[in-house]
């Protein structure tokens, strides 16, 4: 039996370097990158790099040998090779000025078909929905780009069309669940076929070209090329699941014979689709009751006692109420407010919305409509206001969706300081720091207790300040009253107008006898009380003081014992977990400290304001009393 040589088996044969992969596939580096992005092949990190690199200590980019063998049988490889042949022949025709042959070659340009790759990477539709987060975020970003060097205009327009179609599905299915405004953009989360899909829509800022090439738009464009095919398949399946016509179409009632529609019907329809304000054409009418919930309530009632089933019922009821949150409400969006995110929210939950017709096509009613219930404004004041509607800031819509109820509008009026906008994507049962505003939202009873504790502390501080401020005034008044009383006593010779030297000695003897008798009675009563106390005595308990040093020492000893019991192969993992725990505790402590300093500064400001007001009132009262005298 032949003895195997070194690096002929094991980890050395499981990995292959990028240079060897390029030689095996006979592709350039750019084509290899493109192929790996489209097929979902990525570099791997071996457990023992030196063994995987056959004894070499140089750091190389390694791939699984099985993945490269998998790429050898891909039909796209032949298309990428055809690109080289096409480039050589077209350059030759251009050099010899054979434009007739060049035109024929350009018509036969080899195109890459990615349909089979989408089916390979996502065997089921649920698998595609699970990987939809990055797809939507990237396509929403590219839909805002203008025509750049490496991003053609057709690609940006395609991204815009596909994302608008997906938003139409979200509105029609009423599957939106959570929203949040951040610096990065607008976060949306929808529940589609039981899968939670989260994506980011960037803010609408004018594009600023970058001088430095910090972002590789070419690589991102390859990702977009694959994601557009994937989202097209997904939209087709989702639209047909709701019996909606795909591509999106309008019913005949929307396409009225106006001058604008008769001039260019295609642009008229595309503008109305982008407005997100019209119902789409259905291939078959479906009752609303069938669309409400996908949960079989009869199946849940069979096992109604379990906590999980009760929780699912409550969630289903909340979702059914959320779908009709804005039903019966009419909104009007001012020109300074971002239109698209608010239209998505309002229409997803059953509301009606419109805007100024000069901003964008698709408005259904004007600002002067008397049936408008809410007008969304983002400016400090408005010249003309209607009594029949509420003027609110945009945050009210987002907070209502996250709280799943219509909140009072008084905190969101024009010019009001808005309440904190909390993220709904944070777990409420986490161990980290939770701000008091979030606690109050989770448990409304905490609002009253928190406010009551603040009022009690402020009242105590006010009482102390009042005592210190009025102490000097009280002392002066008491001293003045004492002086007046002593003067009257000396003037009239005692309380009854009789001089003390002229009193009878017999009266003094009688008074002394009465005092002695009273003292004897008091002594007897005190003796009886002491005897009764001795019979029914209760021993006072002793206060047990906890020694904090001993408790801390016991915790440290227990932690050390726990660390000793960890197996050697798990020590690095144990240290990592302890480090993460310490960093989390430190962050929580810093946030609590920051909160305490902010609250202390606010409380001190309120105290100083009240103190100054009290001093001014006291000074005014003193001045008034002087004038009265």
UniProtKB/Swiss-Prot annotation:
Spans annotated as Disordered: 439-470, 488-568, 598-629
GO molecular function: ribonucleoprotein complex binding; RNA binding
GO CC terms in record: nucleolus; nucleoplasm; PeBoW complex; preribosome, large subunit precursor
Domain BRCT residues, every copy: 321-414
Biological processes annotated in GO: maturation of 5.8S rRNA from tricistronic rRNA transcript (SSU-rRNA, 5.8S rRNA, LSU-rRNA); maturation of LSU-rRNA from tricistronic rRNA transcript (SSU-rRNA, 5.8S rRNA, LSU-rRNA)
Residue stretches in coiled coil: 584-627
Signal peptide per UniProt: none
Compositionally biased residues, Low complexity: 618-629
Record's compositionally biased regions (Basic residues): 542-551
Annotated localization: Nucleus, Nucleolus; Nucleus, Nucleoplasm
Basic and acidic residues bias (residue ranges): 524-535, 552-561, 598-617
Modified residues (Phosphoserine): 453, 457
SUPFAM superfamilies, sorted: BRCT domain (SSF52113)
Function: Required for maturation of ribosomal RNAs and formation of the large ribosomal subunit.
Compositionally biased intervals (Acidic residues): 454-470, 498-523
SMART domains cross-referenced by the UniProt entry: BRCT
InterPro entries: BRCT_dom (IPR001357), BRCT_dom_sf (IPR036420), PES (IPR010613)
Originating organism: Drosophila erecta (Fruit fly)
Name of the featured protein: Pescadillo homolog
Major localization class: nucleus
Similarity comment: Belongs to the pescadillo family.
Keywords recorded for this protein, A-Z: Coiled coil, Nucleus, Phosphoprotein, Ribosome biogenesis, rRNA processing
